[in-house]
């Protein structure tokens, strides 16, 4: 081999090696190994309202929205056009009911930060919450290992609930 063809072959080998390293590093990008959401639900007695914030990994939410919307690709960002999709999804998977009625959930909005999306809701509520059932099946149709943790603050004291596949409804 001539000197110039040897240098060319060496450059190609290095380039191939760098591309291989880049491909491997991007395909093994650090992804979380668990699927969890955390919900804070607080009763504001003077306002007679539940204030709710749900923290979900953004990539998981994007996948859940995609599966609910015929594989459409979603990219969650602040000030995007996805609020109607997020609202519809949350209304389907987060409900508060008793034997007679379903509480009206008001979607306040969402906020994206780093790797998580915060979803904000309010539920006007003037009754005693005991005996009401809260469904939190967010992302359970997408991930079999999804766990949704909820911290509930009532005037009677705090409670914590865990929701998972097969246990998506808890009695308050």
Regions found by a protein language model. Name each.
Residues 30-172:
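N-terminal soluble domains immediately following signal/targeting peptides that reside
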Residues 3-17:
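Bacterial N-terminal signal peptides that target proteins for export
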Residues 16-26:
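Bacterial N-terminal signal peptides
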Residues 1-5, 10, 22-23, 26-30:
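Intrinsic disorder/low-complexity segments
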């Amino acid at each position: 081999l001539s000197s110039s063809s040897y240098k060319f072959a060496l450059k190609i080998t290095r380039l191939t090696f760098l591309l291989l390293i880049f491909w491997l590093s991007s395909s093994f990008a650090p992804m979380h190994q668990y699927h969890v959401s955390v919900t804070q639900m607080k009763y504001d007695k003077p306002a007679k309202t539940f204030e709710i914030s749900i923290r979900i990994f953004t990539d998981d939410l994007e996948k859940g929205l995609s599966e609910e919307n015929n594989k459409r690709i979603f990219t969650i960002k602040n000030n995007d056009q996805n609020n109607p999709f997020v609202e519809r999804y949350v209304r389907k998977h987060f409900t508060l009911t008793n034997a007679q009625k379903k509480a009206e959930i008001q979607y306040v909005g969402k906020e994206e930060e780093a790797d998580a999306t915060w979803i904000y809701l309010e539920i006007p509520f003037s009754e005693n919450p005991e005996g009401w059932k809260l469904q939190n099946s967010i992302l359970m149709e997408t991930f079999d290992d999804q766990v949704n943790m909820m911290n509930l603050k009532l005037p009677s004291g705090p409670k914590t609930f865990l929701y998972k596949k097969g246990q998506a409804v808890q009695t308050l």
